[in-house]
């Protein structure tokens, strides 16, 4: 069966990580054929440089070369990765004007951060694509899918624009999924994510009219911020809707983040029972999505971990009054770049398989 043709709109941090995840998973050219990447620049040499040298993730295991799409091209505008050719296309303010139809693209991975509204993302469909996967939380009624949690809800006939949620939701939702599936329940919960700084932040104090604290220097401050990640869990696990909220602290690390969930269970339980349930899930129905560690690890130990969420059993706490057994804290790590990017790839592969089985592709 021929690979599904994919286009990536936005070849920044996440766009590149998604592409590199395909290479690492050995699905480029077999299951997925990335025919084009879209960005403000079409300089293949610069893209190749970015892929070859990464401060956090290191050198790739695959070959990266460049070529020209035609003899008349002034500079190389084609990436050649393990022999696969990927055209570099100039970005357009209107996704409907991108040449997806001409290029035969089936799926667009929308990773610019600009077209997260469903109506705007549908421009890619007008441009000739069949489906759009947004690598961010979405608005406007786009279906939100978290792999390992609610992918079974995907409907090929009606879900043409799908959101992969946020990296933090992808970490929190698997933990909550196990707690609810194994009948611990969540009466109410507060989440904090200790989150590495990202490209949207400032290297030195700068202008940030809407978020004053967010404009402060990322590498030397702990910066309180907002996040909708906890509330978004209610979109993929309806039984928790309205029961979870949270906040974020941006901290001076370049990658890997950690979720701290304090919750009240709906029944009496214990740390030992919670540990056992999460460990079993990590080895069975959540394998590859949820991890489990009982080692004395720190954030850098999770760099390049492709799982969405790694439960830290050493960090689990309880604070119950006499006669109570329902108040707990659980902690889970995640590589907010690498793990999340792998889930984008997994989602595209999952949707592609479902679409083909239902003859939507």
Swiss-Prot record:
Signal peptide: none annotated. It catalyses: D-glyceraldehyde 3-phosphate + phosphate + NAD(+) = (2R)-3-phospho-glyceroyl phosphate + NADH + H(+). It is an enzyme of class 1 (oxidoreductase). The record marks 195 as: Activates thiol group during catalysis. Gene3D superfamilies: Dihydrodipicolinate Reductase, domain 2 (3.30.360.10), NAD(P)-binding Rossmann-like Domain (3.40.50.720). Pathway: Carbohydrate degradation; glycolysis; pyruvate from D-glyceraldehyde 3-phosphate: step 1/5. GO terms for cellular component: cytosol; glycosome. The keyword Oxidoreductase applies. The active site is at 167 (nucleophile). NCBIfam families: GAPDH-I (TIGR01534). This is Glyceraldehyde-3-phosphate dehydrogenase, glycosomal.
């Amino acid at each position: 069966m021929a690979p599904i043709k994919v286009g990536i709109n936005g070849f920044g941090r996440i766009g590149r990580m998604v592409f590199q995840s395909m290479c690492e998973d050995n699905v480029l050219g077999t299951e997925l054929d990335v025919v084009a990447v879209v960005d403000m620049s079409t300089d293949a040499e610069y893209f190749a440089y970015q892929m070859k040298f990464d401060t956090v993730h290191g050198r790739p295991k695959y070959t990266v070369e460049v070529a020209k799409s035609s003899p008349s091209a002034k500079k190389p505008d084609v990436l050649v990765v393990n022999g696969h050719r990927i055209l570099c296309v100039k970005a357009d303010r209107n996704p409907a004007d991108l040449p997806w139809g001409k290029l035969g693209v089936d799926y667009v991975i929308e990773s610019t951060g600009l077209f997260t509204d469903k109506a705007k993302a549908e421009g890619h469909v007008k441009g000739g694509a069949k489906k759009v996967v947004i690598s961010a939380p979405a608005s406007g009624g786009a279906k939100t899918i978290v792999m390992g949690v609610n992918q079974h809800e995907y409907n090929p006939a009606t879900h043409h624009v799908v959101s992969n949620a946020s990296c933090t939701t992808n970490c929190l939702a698997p933990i909550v999924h196990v707690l609810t599936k194994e009948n611990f329940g969540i009466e109410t919960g507060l989440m904090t994510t200790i989150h590495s700084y990202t490209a949207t932040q400032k290297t030195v104090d700068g202008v940030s009219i809407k978020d004053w604290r967010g404009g402060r220097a990322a590498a030397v401050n702990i910066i309180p911020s907002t996040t909708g990640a906890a509330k978004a869990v209610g979109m993929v696990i309806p039984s928790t809707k309205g029961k979870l909220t949270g906040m974020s602290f941006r901290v001076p690390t370049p990658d890997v983040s950690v979720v701290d969930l304090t919750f009240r269970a709906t029944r009496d339980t214990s740390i030992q029972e919670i540990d056992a349930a999460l460990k079993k899930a990590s080895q069975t129905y959540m394998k590859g999505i949820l991890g489990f560690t009982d080692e004395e690890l720190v954030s850098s130990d999770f760099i390049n971990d492709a799982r969405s969420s790694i439960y830290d059993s050493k960090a689990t706490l309880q604070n119950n009054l006499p006669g109570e057994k329902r108040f707990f804290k659980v902690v889970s790590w995640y590589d907010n770049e690498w793990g999340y990017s792998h889930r984008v790839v997994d989602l595209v592969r999952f949707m592609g398989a479902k679409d083909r089985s239902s003859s939507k592709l």
